[in-house]
From Swiss-Prot:
The modification Phosphotyrosine is found at Y125. Changing Y136F: No effect on osmotic stress-induced phosphorylation. Changing E35K: No effect on oligomerization. This is Alpha-synuclein.
Amino acid sequence: MDVFMKGLSKAKEGVVAAAEKTKQGVAEAAGKTKEGVLYVGSKTKEGVVHGVATVAEKTKEQVTNVGGAVVTGVTAVAQKTVEGAGSIAAATGFVKKDQLGKNEEGAPQEGILEDMPVDPDNEAYEMPSEEGYQDYEPEA
């Protein structure tokens, strides 16, 4: 019985440690998101679009440190934060509304985080759909 109880105690310690790591990862992701939003706020009209992409990228980098179902929630929060940063930029006159959601080359930025393969159960990952990809044929 002692062996059984000791095993359960060790398992509990492992769960607590994993929860603490997840909590730490979420806190880091939130900190990076805040950094990115402050970065966007300090940019001029020309830099705002690039700044919004930076927020998304920093958040995406930190999301990889967070495991399990938390990833889905962090990704949703990050996307809403990026959308909010863009709205703030438009409201303050840093950028025109028609410039939001495009990178410096004018290509749409939507789907940055949505296409990231995420499995809350950590069982399997699927690649994003290939609808947006084109076949590449090298020139002879």
